[in-house]
Amino acid sequence: MKLSFTKMQGCANDYIYLDCRTSGVPEDIAALSQRLSRRHFSIGADGIICICAPVTAGADAMMRIFNADGSEGKMCGNGIRCVAEWLYTHGTAKPKLAIDTLSGLKTVSRMGEGLWQV
């Protein structure tokens, strides 16, 4: 399996980021998160964050988090700041982004180079 990803960290939370905006979340995401998150044996991370197409009108994207144990999380402040930076550097260069999460719509604002506030 060939997989394009970005690994980012925010305040010691490190995740593997997948662009799922057009392809959708992989069907085996729970097993994939467990496999790729294993430190010393694979990429190693706190889990996988999928950057998906938004579900709320006016949102820029949706963030879905899959922890290293394969469970789905609702929200991660450090993770969403990295999603904002990823979106900003991959064509959505807006200083304020609206990102869907399982905890609702979150607004993330650019405070400076690589600095974001939720």
Tell me the role of every PLM-derived stretch.
Residues 1-112:
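A glycine-rich beta-to-alpha transition motif near the start of alpha/beta enzyme domains, typified by
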Residues 114-118:
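Short, solvent-exposed secondary-structure boundary/capping segments
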